[in-house]
């Protein structure tokens, strides 16, 4: 195997051992050292907590007002019945919520096969036992709400939010939406040519039958990849630093002093002092101008009057003067 020392190995699906319809082992190799645990732990957490599925969330049993009661002619108490319903494996197509009904009488077990449902619902394990009737005259009728969701949602989180709307006799059930019942991974040593420091990831999992184990791993990998897309397309979202713009000067300050139409004497005195723009002139004080050779009080008065007619005066302060357009000249 030739390649750059910085090039990562890409794993390939080596083997899928289908132990049963709900139990499978998936082997993935080769992986760079350490990536077996990195990928295995990430997939395990997603498979246990983030896989969508369907679960029983509410139950109404005729003649039962609360979960701490019993029903005549039924071997199990209500809490046991709710626990058995919690393990019901249901596959629902095209709907987020369905209501199932169950009516059974006479001695014998009550199983998932006794549930009445429409064509959008499939009971995966019809032999799943819900309760047992112990008397010929015993009967049980119930309405079962099945909803689609993700992860695990205990009934306690819904009690307070639904207290005002939930009628007496409607029993809430802890909802375990995840179709994955058990998952474990193991990292073993792998070898590719001369490299012996590689990983082999072996994932073993069991589902409730509503999803194929191979499909479950495929979905988990898709979820992980979608979450990582934000890092793949990472962009610097920081706001660009806004540079403080220097204040713009009044256009009149950028005009040459010749535009003031001063007398020749005054204009020549200003040019001799390198005062070429009106902006240069207004920053001078009266004392500074009087020190200018050949510029007397009469010329000073003329300059002040001309500036005043334009809304300007001597002794003004102009920050960042001269502007770049003048400084470059």
UniProtKB/Swiss-Prot annotation:
Its EC number(s): 2.7.7.6
GO biological process: DNA-templated transcription
Region (Alpha N-terminal domain (alpha-NTD)): 1-235
CDD domains: RNAP_alpha_NTD (cd06928)
InterPro entries: DNA-dir_RNA_pol_insert, DNA-dir_RNA_pol_RpoA/D/Rpb3, DNA-dir_RpoA, RBP11-like, RNAP_asu_C, RNApol_insert_sf
Keywords: DNA-directed RNA polymerase, Nucleotidyltransferase, Transcription, Transferase
SMART domains the record matches: RPOLD
Cellular component GO terms held in the UniProt record: cytoplasm; DNA-directed RNA polymerase complex
Gene3D superfamilies according to UniProt: 5' to 3' exonuclease, C-terminal subdomain (1.10.150.20), DNA-directed RNA polymerase, insert domain (2.170.120.12), RNA polymerase, RBP11-like subunit (3.30.1360.10)
Reactions that this protein is recorded to catalyse: RNA(n) + a ribonucleoside 5'-triphosphate = RNA(n+1) + diphosphate
Single annotated GO MF: DNA binding
Broadest EC class assigned to this enzyme: transferase
Domain of life from the UniProt record: Bacteria
Disulfide bridge partners, by residue number: none
Segments for region (Alpha C-terminal domain (alpha-CTD)): 249-329
A Pfam short name: RNA_pol_L
Function, in words: DNA-dependent RNA polymerase catalyzes the transcription of DNA into RNA using the four ribonucleoside triphosphates as substrates.
HAMAP family: RNApol_bact_RpoA (MF_00059)
UniProt similarity note: Belongs to the RNA polymerase alpha chain family.
Subunit structure: Homodimer. The RNAP catalytic core consists of 2 alpha, 1 beta, 1 beta' and 1 omega subunit. When a sigma factor is associated with the core the holoenzyme is formed, which can initiate transcription.
Name assigned to this protein: DNA-directed RNA polymerase subunit alpha
Organism: Salmonella choleraesuis (strain SC-B67)
């Amino acid at each position: 195997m030739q390649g750059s020392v910085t090039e990562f190995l890409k794993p390939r699906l080596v083997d899928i051992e289908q132990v049963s319809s709900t139990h499978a082992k998936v082997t993935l190799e080769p992986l760079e050292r350490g990536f077996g645990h990195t990928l295995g732990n990430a997939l395990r957490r997603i498979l246990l907590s983030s896989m969508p599925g369907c679960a029983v969330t509410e139950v109404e049993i005729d003649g039962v007002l609360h979960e701490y009661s019993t029903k005549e002619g039924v071997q199990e108490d209500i809490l046991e019945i709710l626990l058995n319903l919690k393990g019901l494996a249901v596959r629902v197509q095209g709907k987020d919520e369905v209501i199932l009904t169950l009516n059974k009488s006479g001695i014998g077990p009550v199983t998932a096969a006794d549930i009445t449902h429409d064509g959008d619902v499939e009971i995966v394990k019809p032999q799943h036992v819900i309760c047992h009737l112990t008397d010929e005259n015993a009967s049980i009728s119930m309405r079962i709400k099945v909803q689609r969701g993700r992860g695990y949602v205990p009934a306690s989180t819904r009690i307070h939010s639904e207290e005002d709307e939930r009628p007496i006799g409607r029993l809430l059930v802890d909802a375990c939406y995840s179709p994955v019942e058990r998952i474990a991974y193991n990292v073993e040593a792998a070898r590719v040519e001369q490299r012996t420091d590689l990983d082999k990831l072996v994932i073993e999992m069991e589902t409730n039958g509503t999803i194929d184990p191979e499909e479950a791993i495929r979905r988990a990998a898709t979820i992980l990849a979608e979450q990582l897309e934000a890092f793949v397309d990472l962009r610097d979202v920081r706001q660009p630093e806004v540079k403080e713009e220097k204040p713009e000067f009044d256009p009149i300050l950028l005009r040459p002093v010749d535009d003031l139409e001063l007398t020749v004497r005054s204009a020549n005195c200003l040019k001799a002092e390198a005062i070429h723009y009106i902006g240069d002139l207004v920053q001078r004080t009266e004392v500074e101008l009087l020190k200018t050779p050949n510029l007397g009080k009469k010329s000073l008065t003329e300059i002040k009057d001309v500036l005043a007619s334009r809304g300007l005066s001597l002794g003004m302060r102009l920050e960042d003067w001269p502007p770049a357009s003048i400084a470059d000249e």
